[in-house]
Amino acid sequence: VGIYGITNGVFVLGSSPVELADGTFRQPAEHVLFPGDYILAVNHHAVTSKEDLTVLIQKNETVSMVLTILRGNEQIDVSVTPVLAKTGENNKLNYMLGIWVRDDMAGIGTMTYYDDNGNYGALGHGIGDGETGELLKLDKGYLYEADILGIKRGQRGDPGELEGVISYRKTSMLGTVRQNSDIGIYGKLNDEYINEIKDKNKPYLMGFKQDLKTGEAYIISDVSGERQTYHIMMDSFDYSPSDRNKGIHFYVDDERLLSLTGGIVQGMSGSPIIQDGRIVGAV
């Protein structure tokens, strides 16, 4: 599936110096804004996108402005003053804070399961920012259809990845994202999509920690273009891991998957792990 998320406010990646008209450099947001901050409002005007932030900065010009930010779990106000700085190849002057920001994310992952009520779990890990490593706080998100166009094989030192495209058509939306956690994303599927896939899926019992055992198991993936079951060997378990994403250690011994991908590649995250007819985990 394709995953698209919109952040809660504007996410700060970092700050950097900007060049003023006289050729000197200033860094207005230094020691004020930090990677991982979320800008929620400017002078008490809500900010939901990069465009909102840009417009409000331009309106404020070089007057000190109050930013309402979320830092960790604490909401605070900070003050920062924009500067008139050069931008682009033509050195056009704009009011700037000298910050790098983002307001959305997109990627491809695998849905692990859904229940009779259409509640699903996917991805097997949280959606984090690639620059800061921070788990993103999402205001809302959506699942879309995705097509796999190719596979970059994994090799030592390079995990490889599935290469694909997400269809953002309204008719391609499969559901919504309600929670982004460190062990996966969770949400609700559309009724239309549930009706479309209900006869194509096999129900499994839910497994518990005490059901795990070393030895053979399977993962389910459509990495080949159609859904397949691939053999793996469960090697060891950590029932109280410091990282909740690393409780199961297994290796792939299915030659079909090894020849296709070289093992587990990015984009296969969330593939269900099946042992003795139960879903016992996710890649």
Which role does the model predict for each range below?
Residues T54-L97:
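PDZ-domain C-terminal substructure recognizer with occasional recognition of PDZ-binding tails
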Residues H45-L56, D77, Q228-H231:
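Short, Lys/Arg- and Gly-enriched loop/turn segments at beta-strand edges
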Residues P28-K50, I274-D276, V280-G281:
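Conserved PDZ fold ligand-binding element
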Residues P17-D37, S269:
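PDZ/PDZ-like domain micro-motif
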Residues I76-D77, G121, V280-G281:
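Generic structural signal for well-ordered beta-strand positions
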Residues N8, P35-G36, K213, S269, ...:
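Short, flexible surface segments
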Residues V1-L13:
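N-terminal, Lys/Arg-enriched amphipathic/low-complexity engagement segments
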Residues V83-L84, N90-G262, Q266, Q275-D276:
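Serine endopeptidase catalytic core focused on the charge-relay Asp
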